[in-house]
Amino acid sequence: MEVILLEKVRNLGNLGDKVHVKSGYGRNYLIPQNKAVFATEQNIELFQKRRAELEKKAQQALANAEQRAAKLNDTTIVISAMASDEGKLYGSVGVNEIKDALIEKQIEISKREIVMPEGPLHSIGNYVVEVHVHSDVVANLQVEIISAK
């Protein structure tokens, strides 16, 4: 199925690109999330008329994401967790704990923006966690895990 992207989609294309996607991906994700429309003649003409408006909206979203990333890059969060004498945690520190610590600092973030490719953290120490605030903007958040005794 052919669709026209209304915003940049990671690993697919940019605003205004006409791309071929599987029917399920288009109908169940891209179109309901307003990330794309069917590539009909009528939609192509409508998109050409709205292109400047959509590009301006995308630029505003990018500028907003860069501001959030700058704030996150300057932030260090400290998470206290129960740990053994060797520094191993009794459990782990994952996305939920990081999100809760950021909310305590009045920084709004969603769980899906936090990326931990190696999985949850299992020991005391300092870590850098990636936060994908936009498809083009990645912030590095400093996380310090200390022992709660």
UniProtKB/Swiss-Prot annotation:
Keywords: Ribonucleoprotein, Ribosomal protein, RNA-binding, rRNA-binding
The UniProt record lists the keyword Transport: no
GO BP terms, alphabetized: translation
Transmembrane residue ranges: none
Cellular-component GO terms for this entry: ribonucleoprotein complex; ribosome
GO molecular function, one term: rRNA binding
Top-level taxon in the UniProt lineage: Bacteria
Protein family: Belongs to the bacterial ribosomal protein bL9 family.
Functional description taken from the UniProt entry: Binds to the 23S rRNA.
Record-given protein name: Large ribosomal subunit protein bL9
Gene of this entry: rplI
